[in-house]
Amino acid sequence: MMQSSPSNSRELKTNRLGCDIAVIGGGLAGVCAAITAARAGSQVVLVQDRPVLGGNASSEVRLWILGATSHMGNNNRWAREGGVIDEILVENMYRNPEGNPLILDTIILEMVVNESNITLLLNTAVHDLEKSDADTIKSVRAFCSQNSTTYQITAPVFVDASGDGIVGFLAGAAFRIGTEASSEFGEKFAPEKASSELLGHTIYFYSKDTGRPVKFIPPSFALRDITKIPRWRDIKINDTGCRLWWLEWGGTLDTIHDSEKIKWELWKVAYGVWNHIKNSGQFPDAATLTLEWVGTIPGKRESRRFEGDVMIKQQDLVEQRQHADTVSFGGWAIDLHPSDGVFSAQPGCQQWHSKGVFQIPYRAMYSRNIKNLFLAGRIISASHIAFGSTRVMATCAHNGQAVGVAAAICAKNELQPRDLLAAPSMQELQRELLRIGQYIPGVALVDEKDLARTAEITATSELKLSQFAPSGETMPLDASWAMMLPVQPGAMPSVEFLLDVSAPTTLRTELRLSSKPDNHTPEVTLVTQEIKLRTGALIKLPLKFDVVIDASCYAFVCLMTNPDVAVHLSDQRVTGVLAVKQKFNRAVAKSPRQEPPAGCGIDSFEFWIPQRRPAGKNLALKIDPPLAVFSVQNLTNGFARPTNQPNAWVADFSHEQPVISLAWDKPQTIARIELSFDSDFDHPMESVLMGHPERVMPFCVREVMVAIPAKIPVLAGYHNGNGSKSSDTERLIFQIAENHQSRQIIRLATPVTTDALELRLVAPGANVPAALFEVRCYSDI
């Protein structure tokens, strides 16, 4: 028993924590920053003011995670973000293809608690801080409502990933709220005058079918007059969860201090919409539906944006400007919403895409006036226009990974964020990011510690792509289609399609390229041919192109719309080769061709996008000469996804169990092997609501054996042996079974010293040859 006598006052219990890095905010940006920093060796305290991690992606809000892939609705091919956010998305696809947000919660929590270097504080809100001088944070104070404990967290480096920027605000970091005038940054899409208008908050709901009639009596605060929503006719019975993104409000208010007011208005709207669905009589199929869940906190879009040493602007996105300090990338559209949200008569959003992904500079990821403060998430240094793209969660997470590694370097070397701009430090940061799977457009990994770079690498086969064999299935040319073929400088190969023609007709074909080799927007037409076709089945269509390709790139061999023609398809798939259709995805575009308002500084171009599986098959064709772009040299070229080329070694279709061999001039001690697989970076892997037909991507190699081949000397340390001995039989040193991830790190319990290694892979399927982007070997664990 405990008794306490009366007292004038009491103090809360206080826990004092010291760490290398304090990360405030447990959304995806904070989570990815914390994990990458912890894996880099830093002691991290992760402070989250909610009971779960994930922010807007969590079960509290239930927004799907998206980024540069943009629902596969733009021309950003193979643009899913890499690193930790990729691990999360791929693991969620494997465990949770149905898109249950509760399962996603567990995956994110598991990844954090599995890191021994992270101390996680849930339900803990930062409310105060202490500074050691005017521009340096010493510690933050936070309160946990669940255990009535105050935490004082001291660190040399802080990461503000809190969404509203609580640490930056308390520290006095420069920030802004609202919309800049076009004159400030020369942004043609910005308004003439600055304003306080913002994007608003959103609350979603889920419904389910009970199989029996269910009555709904709305709460007194529900919106009764549905016509107050100008777009009330857009309400659909099947819309649920984040498909209701347009139920948005609050952009004309203070989206920080008025958040509770905004929440109540959004509850009013959400229950009013459901009342309309249930009780208006317009949706008879809703009789057996009931509400399953309504959000209790709003998903926030915009509030403070903090100022770094540079502010990302419209031109950085549209013109794809290059930055020496690039550490991340974006690719979502400039996606802005009317500030009145659901009560606006305007469309719920306007989305304007770039022709490809854009670099994000490191200088936008730290405060310009608080020396030891990193910025992560939607608060990074960007104009309101650029924020329209950089705000989405996968982009925020990818940026957070850059911040996490940078913070770890700073903590280890007693540096401040700005110190990493010096060339050697920036190269180290980029190198460390690329090592962990981060994609930085245009930057290749050059890793002096990688022993594979000095090995002679061979394989039992390399694909020379001469055809996609026809399956017997055909597809009418109800739209224009193209095969994206990776070509090298020199004469363009000829191709031959297989057609069925229902009536005499003339088919238009085109050969197109992108104006930039790393882009996949086919706006440059090199050759146009009008070919007369007779009626018949299995008609061969040979196409020869008298053109020379100047640089390694993807060529689009296009068959334009013709209702009298059907093209034969193939069941074969190959890493880095796709068929694309000239169409649009209504989720992110209004028409097959983007036509922005004149003078707004945004490009016009066509969308050529693939179909999702189980559709999305390649067009059957022959290629002469075969494409020889899948060699083992790709395994050490520094790129771990398709860019302007596939960047993958691919085995021949006939080799079900190909072998990659590494040989050195002298024995090497190997403790760690890293492999990069094809988890289909073109797939957005939407995390919730949208179900997916696959748990493992069809290109992903599931089984790998790592062995020391026979007749190779094996030196001390292998299998606890003493001295040198010779192996007459193959020695299996590691085996991967049922892989589904993009990356696997093999840490050998006992390092081996050898002058040869073999990787034995099993092809994912009869119609998909084995492929690998990277193999790296290291002497350290």
Model-derived features: positions:
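Conserved N-terminal/central alpha/beta ligand/cofactor-binding core
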Residues: 8-13, 18, 36, 42-43, ...
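Flavin (FAD/FMN)-binding glycine-rich loop and adjacent Rossmann-like elements that form
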Residues: 11, 15, 56, 132, ...
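Beta1/beta-strand and adjacent pyrophosphate-binding region of the FAD-binding site
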Residues: 15-27
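PGST-rich, cysteine-poor low-complexity/disordered linker and tail segments that act as flexible spacers
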Residues: 576-653, 659-660
